[in-house]
Structure formats: C-alpha cells, structure tokens
Amino acid sequence: MIPDDVATELGRVVRRWQQLPLDRAAERVVGVHELMAQLAGEPLPDLGPAVVMDQLRVVVFDACRVEGGPPHLAEQLASLRLGWA
C-alpha cells in the first residue's frame, strides 16, 4: 500500500520527531501541518506535537491509497525531516 521509499522515510521522520525536545517540536509542527494539508487537500486540526506524527501517518497512508501515491512524497518527507536538524 505505501511504497517502500515512503514507508522508510516516514519511519525516519517519526523517529526523528520523537528525539526532538518538546519546545523544538512545537516550533516545527507548522511545517508538518503544511505537508499534511497539501496531501489531504484541506487543513487538519492542530492537536499538538504529541499527536502530529499519528496524524501524519494516517494522511500518508490515505494519500498512498491512490495508485502510485503523490509524486515525490519520500523526498518531501526527507526534506521535512532534514529541516529539523
């Protein structure tokens, strides 16, 4: 269902997010919401940094249900993660 490259990068994003201090995660949640809104086609509720990775997983799964999924999704996830360095 989820292409291997997307699943790998999503796992990396989630692991990196779990390593971020709460204040840094709170500062970066906006970027996650921007990507989710792009994938979902509408803004999603802000449930805070503790839940945003669960939201991202669901949105990525739903986006990949369409044949082939969004182009360059793995690269978008990598860019998001690398922006937290």
Residue locations for each model-derived region?
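Short, charged early-sequence alpha-helical segments and their helix-coil boundaries
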Residues: 43-59
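Short terminal alpha-helical segments
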Residues: 1-37, 74, 80-81
